[in-house]
């Protein structure tokens, strides 16, 4: 459901007209699972999800309140069942708690029956025993807590009007339950934790290949957030699954996490990544070309990986990534005075000096993708929005007012790149020039 001002230039499809209805929907929100926001926050030392927070989309200055339930039920998005990988246990390919991993598969049809899109779910990381033990009690660490059905929206939609290039492909969402971007391979017996992300990746691919993916004429590996990072890490592995005759490419959405300096002068995300790498023994599964010259933690950062990925890769990212602002640039641990509290949740409340700091972050991101964008095989869509994950959201992927750069929307840019219909190296001007953004605003 959406709530919007009547004079808004953005006309949402669903509008709450009844105050009573709005209150009921807001109460229902606590019972609903999340769809879009894959962020994590630290609460009492544990990784919690932004699902706990009310969030808004702001389009062209208009605030739009959204709850997940009606967006799915009224728009009639397909609900796709969870498949547990029964052969995974014998391979040691299990979630943090030892439960079976899984995926959701919606079969393709017509001209797309032999094409495959595999989406890797995101959801942050756990960097300490305590965080990972907590994560075992959520869908991010155990299939026991995963939804039995989820809606397929955005790039996973089966409707040509919502997803023109991939709607009739076999579309898969691989669930994320290892806390290490599908890359770990270790365990902690004392805490009864299994860090088996790499094995989950292998088990999922083997299962999908057996279900017809090995006959794919075209394949796309995509993912959002921690799943977007996993795409970069696993892209060449995915490419090697197929013969040279298969068109294989990769799309990383909101996975370009920078090794950035935070507002206190420290490196909050580097500290988190160092914990993940150490705890999950990631160094054995990180790209060898990187660990031969850099330390393992550095090799978990995309900026040190993307130029060496051989398989065609598309980087889609918001230049003012909401997750990175909240958890890397201005986390509470780096802002004890709370001077960033308002800006962290709402870009419109940032001071001039805070915006200047964020502009420096954008400049660094732009500079880091310039070399990557030079080869014709690669694509870039770097929009100057306060957002995170734009492929699975109907409103940002291919809606009437979806974000665009030079009048080209995200879905069109990705399609042009994948099918080689035209150029797709799009880098936006700096904030506040882009009036097409669907910026995220949060309220605790």
Curated annotation (Swiss-Prot):
One of its GO terms (cellular component) is extracellular region. Its main location: secreted. InterPro entries: PAE/NOTUM. GO terms for molecular function: hydrolase activity. Its EC number is 3.1.1.-. Belongs to the pectinacetylesterase family. This is Pectin acetylesterase 2. It comes from Arabidopsis thaliana (Mouse-ear cress).
């Amino acid at each position: 459901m959406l709530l919007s001002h009547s004079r808004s230039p953005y006309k949402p499809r669903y509008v709450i007209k009844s105050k009573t209805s709005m209150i009921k929907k807001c109460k229902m929100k606590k019972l609903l699972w999340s769809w879009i926001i894959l962020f994590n926050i630290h609460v009492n030392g544990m990784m919690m999800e932004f699902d706990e927070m009310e969030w808004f989309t702001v389009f062209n200055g208009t605030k739009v309140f959204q709850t997940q339930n009606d967006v799915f039920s009224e728009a009639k998005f397909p609900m796709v069942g969870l498949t547990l990988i029964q052969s995974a246990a014998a391979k040691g390919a299990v979630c943090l708690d030892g439960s079976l991993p899984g995926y959701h598969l919606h079969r393709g049809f017509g001209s797309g029956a032999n094409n495959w899109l595999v989406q890797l779910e995101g959801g942050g990381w756990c960097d300490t025993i305590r965080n990972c033990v907590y994560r075992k009690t959520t869908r991010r660490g155990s299939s026991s807590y995963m939804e039995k059905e989820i809606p397929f929206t955005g790039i996973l939609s089966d409707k040509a009007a919502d997803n023109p290039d991939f709607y009739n492909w076999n579309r898969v969402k691989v669930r994320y339950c290892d806390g290490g971007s599908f890359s770990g391979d270790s365990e902690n017996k004392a805490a009864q934790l299994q860090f088996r992300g790499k094995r989950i990746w292998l088990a999922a691919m083997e299962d999908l290949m057996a279900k017809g993916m090995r006959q794919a004429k075209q394949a796309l590996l995509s993912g959002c957030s921690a799943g977007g990072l996993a795409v970069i890490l696993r892209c060449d592995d995915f490419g090697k699954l197929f013969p040279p005759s298969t068109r294989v490419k990769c799309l990383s959405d909101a996975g370009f996490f920078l090794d950035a300096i935070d507002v206190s002068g420290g490196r909050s995300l580097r500290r988190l990544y160092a914990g993940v790498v150490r705890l999950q023994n990631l160094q054995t599964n990180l790209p060898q070309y990187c660990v031969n010259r850099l330390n393992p933690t550095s090799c978990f950062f995309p900026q040190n990986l993307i130029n060496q990925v051989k398989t065609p890769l598309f980087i889609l990212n918001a230049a003012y990534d909401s997750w990175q602002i909240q958890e890397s640039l201005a986390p509470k641990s780096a802002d004890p005075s709370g001077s960033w509290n308002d800006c962290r949740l709402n870009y419109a409340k940032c001071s001039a000096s805070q915006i200047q700091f964020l502009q420096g972050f954008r400049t660094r991101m732009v500079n880091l993708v310039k070399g990557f964008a030079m080869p014709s095989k690669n694509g870039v869509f770097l929009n100057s929005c306060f957002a995170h994950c734009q492929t699975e959201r109907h409103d940002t992927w291919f809606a009437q007012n979806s974000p665009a750069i030079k009048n080209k929307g995200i879905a069109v840019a990705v399609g042009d790149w994948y099918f080689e219909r035209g150029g797709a190296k799009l880098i936006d001007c700096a904030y506040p020039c882009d009036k097409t953004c669907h910026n995220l605003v949060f309220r605790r």
